[in-house]
């Protein structure tokens, strides 16, 4: 498996040794390029997800989806982006202008920050701290603040009600989400995202294989809680159109609305990417202990494995959204506090016992 850190080391040596750049300038150039790469990747994946959502929705409803703009509707997303860019950005007269303008920025900052923790390949993780799981959950929580400020700052009763629903839902489901991540940390022995993936390299080393029953339970609870955390159907009570028009971003237009729309889709990918990283091996290929098979699998680039797993989980979550009816807010909270969180907590205890007694697959 190719180690992408070789490329970064070569580029650093190119700047400092070959071109003679001082260390501070080399670091600055590298940070700018990495930041630009994150934003480009963020935008490209958002475009793919928006197009994918429309097509998946259409096929589940026996339709074709967008077909007019470009071949097979491939340019529809770009047309929508152009339309959104040229729309006027207006602020409601009685809105709290500071909160109104800061809210979409907080939502997009939390989304981009969490996106930066995903390990794309061996040695290709932008933010790779030894407490990565902890920082990931902390940064992703910024979005909750942004959603609440959007509702409060809009001075709209529907937006406020939507923001309250969204905040209580996201805070509640973060409990189960974190418990599932702690379950994985107990088994792998590290909170570093790259370390979690490296612990899953080898025959039958993916976490759902190593940790068997408790790891599989944690995986499914994580997907359900993550779907609710991203405000996706059937947990999209914060944007219930029949009750709250457009939810907390009712009063937003242009790129203000675009930031919320963009963050929603990328949060879906982030949840899928974290699940793929923590439970399905991330960029690690599937190895079964047969030399010929494993050798072929190892030839496939790690980024292909990661994106394949992540987009497969995205498709599963989209399938769930367009299959199940929307839950009421009381049903959503009941599912979390009466079922998912006790199950995740019990599962954490079981995983602790499994690891302590050495009952996992080594």
Segments from the language model and where they lie:
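Selective transmembrane helix interface/packing segments
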Residues: 1-362
């Amino acid at each position: 498996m190719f180690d992408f850190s070789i490329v970064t080391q070569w580029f650093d040596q190119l700047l400092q040794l070959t071109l003679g750049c001082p260390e501070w300038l080399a670091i600055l150039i590298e940070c700018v390029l990495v930041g630009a790469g994150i934003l480009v990747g963020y935008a490209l994946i958002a475009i793919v997800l928006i197009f994918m959502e429309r097509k998946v929705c259409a096929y589940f409803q026996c339709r074709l989806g967008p077909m007019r703009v470009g071949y097979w509707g491939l340019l529809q997303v770009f047309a929508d982006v152009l339309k959104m860019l040229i729309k006027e950005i207006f602020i409601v007269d009685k809105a709290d202008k500071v909160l109104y303008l800061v809210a979409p920025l907080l939502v997009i900052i939390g989304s981009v920050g969490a996106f930066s923790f995903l390990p794309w390949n061996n040695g290709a993780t932008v933010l790779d701290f030894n407490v990565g799981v902890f920082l990931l959950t902390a940064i992703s929580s910024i979005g909750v603040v942004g959603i609440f400020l959007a509702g409060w700052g809009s001075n709209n009763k529907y937006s406020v009600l939507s923001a309250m629903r969204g905040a209580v839902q996201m805070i509640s489901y973060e409990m189960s989400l974190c418990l599932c991540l702690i379950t994985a940390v107990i088994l792998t022995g590290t909170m570093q995202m790259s370390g979690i993936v490296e612990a899953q390299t080898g025959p039958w080393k993916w976490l759902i294989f190593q940790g068997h029953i408790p790891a599989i339970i944690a995986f499914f609870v994580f997907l359900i809680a993550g779907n609710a955390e991203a405000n996706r159907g059937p947990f999209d009570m914060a944007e219930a159109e029949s009750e709250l028009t457009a939810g907390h971003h009712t009063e937003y237009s242009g790129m203000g609305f675009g930031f919320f729309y963009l963050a929603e889709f990328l949060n879906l990918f982030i949840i899928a990417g974290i699940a793929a990283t923590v439970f399905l091996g991330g960029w690690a290929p599937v190895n079964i202990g047969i030399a010929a098979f494993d050798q072929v699998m190892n030839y496939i680039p790690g980024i292909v494995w990661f994106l394949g797993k992540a987009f497969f989980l995205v498709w599963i979550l989209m399938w769930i959204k367009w299959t199940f009816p929307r839950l009421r807010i009381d049903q959503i909270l009941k599912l979390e506090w009466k079922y998912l969180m006790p199950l995740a907590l019990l599962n954490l205890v079981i995983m602790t016992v499994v690891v302590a007694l050495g009952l996992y697959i080594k």
